[in-house]
Every structure is written in structure tokens, then in C-alpha cells.
Design a protein with these regions (language model features):
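Intrinsically disordered, Lys/Arg-rich low-complexity segments
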Residues: 255-313
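Bulky hydrophobic/aromatic packing residues
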Residues: 3, 63, 128-130, 187, ...
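A basic, amphipathic helix-loop patch mediating RNA/tRNA/ribosome contacts
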Residues: 1-45, 206
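RNA pseudouridine synthases
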Residues: 26, 39-251
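Intrinsic structural disorder
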Residues: 1, 7, 243-249, 293-296
């Protein structure tokens, strides 16, 4: 982990404040002054600020935040727009959002102080449930795509105008339910296992339908329930237990995958070794056979020309 990031995740200082401390020469690693913001902190490194040791946090903290519409999921915005960190208490300014909700979307957003957990959760196939409202009636084509999945060579409809994402593959929805219908709109609850860039807006945009409202209400079993807009709460004990169980499963799966890869490499090396041994044995056998044939030929030649080997020049 980069030094400034390490400091922001394990102390009261923000990343910008960490940069200033490093620049001022107030940060040491193993008692040596460090002025490189990008220094990669290694396991066993002793990081200190003004002589005080910065201890790496081992305890996990998770919060649920009800993101309001009109806020960005980012630390800062060059255009001065409101971010979620303008709404969160300052003690959470170093927390990492797990996934994204776009500017016009609202609802459940998980944040953590653990980069490793954030990475695992963002890559997970955990269910994400949304309440959405589109400006069209639901069609048979939409339902078929929700059930079967969809690949679009051109998925720009519904995407941000500056997005560089062109094509997109949509996995089948885990679940969908129609919750309201009128001539001009349809309300749905849908569950996905992905969190791709403006995924639902692009999906329905393909069918010329605009998503008017989008609210995430659940992620991996963590529910928004009645948490007010713009407010946050810590995980409950049950939620912490569930996340620790999930992380344990991920670690076990990774360990099993690593073992299988090591076994595969070992088996491949063994096959290669046996192949080389077989080829070497074949070469030696061929060489021995050639030698035997030469000796036979030489003997036959000597019999046919008994005086040849005594020939004098």
C-alpha cells in the first residue's frame, strides 16, 4: 500500500494531510525519513509520524450510507459538485465506497476502512437489489433479456456522454418483480449480481426506456430498510458475522484455487519431466542401436576384406 494511503487508512489524517506530513519530513519508516509519497509500505515496516508509531488497523469497520440523489461517489470533484463525503461525518473521510451509484441514483452504499475488503466486495457476485422506475411499459423483449441476459455491441444509450465504455454484456437478472404499472411508466424491483457502469440505465436504454428513479435497497443481504436519506449507520453484529463468514469463504476459495493451480503446475512439470526422460531414453536407445549397427557393419566389412586392417601405406 502506498505510504500516503497507509497513513490515511490508519490514522486521523486524510491523504492530502498525509502528503503534507511526508513533504515536511515528519514521516519516517524504520526510523528513516521518507519524502516519497508513493513509497510502498511493506509488511514489517515501522511507520511513524512525529515519532509516534502508526499502527495498522486489524479490526474491520463497515457502515451503511443512504446516498442522496445529486451526490458523487468520490473523494473530491474538480467541478466542485457535492460528494458523499460532504454528507458523511469527518471520521469516515478515509473510508472506501464499495461500488458506485451514479449522480442521479440513491440508496444503499456500503463503505469500509479496509482496502482488501472493499476490493473483495466490489469483485463479488453478491446480490444487489434495486427499486427502479422506467418511462415505458415493460415489454416482452425486456423480460426475455432480463431472463436470458443480453450482449450489446453498442451500449452507449443510458451511459454517460463521456464514458469510454462502448459494448457491454448483461448477465441474466437474478429476480425481477413488477411493482406498479401505468400508461407512462413501470415500477420494478430487480436483483443483479453485478455492478457495472450504469448497468440498468444502459440495459433499459437499449429498449429506448429511460430510468427515471433508481434506488439500491440491498447489497449482499445488507438492507437499507428505514435509514433516512443522507444518514449512516454501523453494521449490526449479525451483519459483521455474515461479512466475516463471507470473507472466510473467499479466503478458503482463494486458497483452494491456489492449491489447484500449484497442483496443476506440479503435474505439468512432472509430465514434462517424464516426457523429457522418455525422449532422452529414446535418444539413447537410438544412439545405442546406431552404434550396434555400425559395429556389425564393421565386422562384416572386416570379414569380407581380411587384409584391410593390415594394409600398409
Amino acid at each position: 500500500m502506498r505510504l500516503n494511503k497507509f497513513i490515511s487508512h490508519n490514522s486521523k489524517y486524510s491523504r492530502r494531510e498525509a502528503d503534507k506530513l511526508i513533504e515536511a519530513g515528519e514521516v519516517t519508516i524504520n526510523k528513516v525519513k521518507i519524502e516519497n509519497f508513493g513509497y510502498e509500505v511493506k509488511e514489517g515496516d515501522l511507520v511513524s509520524i512525529r515519532g509516534l508509531h502508526v499502527k495498522e488497523k486489524t479490526e474491520l469497520t463497515m457502515i451503511v450510507f443512504n446516498k442522496p440523489k445529486g451526490t458523487l461517489v468520490t473523494q473530491k470533484d474538480d467541478r466542485g459538485r457535492t460528494t458523499i463525503f460532504h454528507k458523511l461525518p469527518g471520521k469516515f473521510r478515509h473510508f472506501i465506497p464499495i461500488g458506485r451509484l451514479d449522480f442521479a441514483s440513491e440508496g444503499l452504499l456500503l463503505l469500509t476502512d479496509s482496502p482488501k475488503v472493499a476490493d473483495v466486495m466490489m469483485k463479488s457476485g453478491l446480490d444487489r437489489t434495486y427499486n427502479i422506475k422506467i418511462d415505458k411499459p415493460l415489454t416482452a423483449e425486456m423480460e426475455e433479456a432480463m431472463k436470458e441476459g443480453l450482449f450489446l455491441d453498442d451500449a452507449r444509450a443510458g451511459g454517460h456522454e463521456k464514458s469510454k465504455i462502448y459494448s457491454m454484456e448483461f448477465a441474466p437478472f437474478v429476480y425481477y418483480e413488477v411493482r406498479g404499472v401505468s400508461e407512462n411508466f413501470t415500477k420494478l424491483r430487480v436483483t443483479l449480481t453485478e455492478g457495472k457502469n450504469r448497468e440498468l440505465r444502459r440495459f433499459f436504454g437499449h429498449f429506448d426506456a429511460n430510468v427515471l428513479d433508481l434506488k439500491r435497497v440491498e447489497f449482499g443481504g445488507i438492507q437499507l430498510n428505514n435509514l433516512p436519506t443522507g444518514k449512516n449507520r454501523y453494521f449490526t453484529r449479525r451483519e459483521y458475522d455474515d461479512i466475516h463468514k463471507y470473507l472466510k469463504m473467499v479466503r478458503q476459495a482463494e486458497a483452494q484455487e491456489q492449491k489447484e493451480e500449484e497442483d496443476r503446475v506440479r503435474a505439468e512439470r512432472l509430465r514434462e519431466k517424464k516426457k523429457n526422460q522418455t525422449e532422452d531414453q529414446a535418444r539413447r536407445a537410438e544412439s545405442a542401436e546406431k552404434k550396434r549397427l555400425r559395429e556389425i557393419k564393421q565386422k562384416n566389412s572386416n570379414r569380407n576384406n581380411p587384409n584391410k586392417k593390415n594394409k600398409k601405406f
